[in-house]
Amino acid sequence: MIGPERVFFDTAPFIYLIENHPEYYAPVSEYLAMCASREKIFLTSVITIAEFGVLPKRTGNLILLDNLTNMLRELNFQVVEINQDTAQLSSTLRARYTFLKGIDAFQLAAAIYTDCSEFYTNDKPLKNIQEIKVTVASK
C-alpha cells in the first residue's frame, strides 16, 4: 500500500471511549493515540453510527450521539458508505466464514473495500478473518 496506513474502527471501541468503559477505555485510548502518532488514517462506516445510536435513543441519552459526532469530526474519521460492491464482498465473507454475523460482515467488507490494512474491534472471533489484519482491544 502506498501512503499512510488506514485503520478501520468497529463500533465497540467508540462505545468504550465515549462511555468511559472501566476496563477498555485506557487500552482503546492508547491504541488510538499510537495510531495517531504514526499518522494512520481513521475510518469507520455508517453502520457504526447506526449501531452506536441504539442505546442512546432507547434511553434518551442523546448527548452520547453528539459525543460520537464530535469524536468522528475531531479525529478526522472518514465515514464509509455501504454500496453494492461492499454488499457483494460482505456476502462473500459470510459465505466463507459461517460464524460471521451480517453486521460484522458489512463492517469488515467496508474496511477491505477501502483498502484498510487493519480492523480494530473487540470481537475476538473476527481474528479468524484472513482478508485483513484484525486487532482486538485488550484490557
Model regions and ranges:
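Conserved glycosyltransferase catalytic-site signature
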Residues: 11, 46, 104-108
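Short, well-structured N-terminal submotif of metal-dependent ribonuclease cores
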Residues: 1-44, 57-66, 124, 139
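Active-site neighborhoods of divalent-metal-dependent phosphate/nucleic-acid chemistry enzymes
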Residues: 2, 77-120
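Short acidic-hydrophobic, aromatic-tinged amphipathic segments that line or gate anion-handling sites
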Residues: 79-82, 134-139
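Short loop/helix-cap segments at secondary-structure boundaries that form the rim of catalytic
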Residues: 124-132
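A generic structural signal for short hydrophobic patches within well-formed alpha-helices
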Residues: 14, 49, 87, 126-127
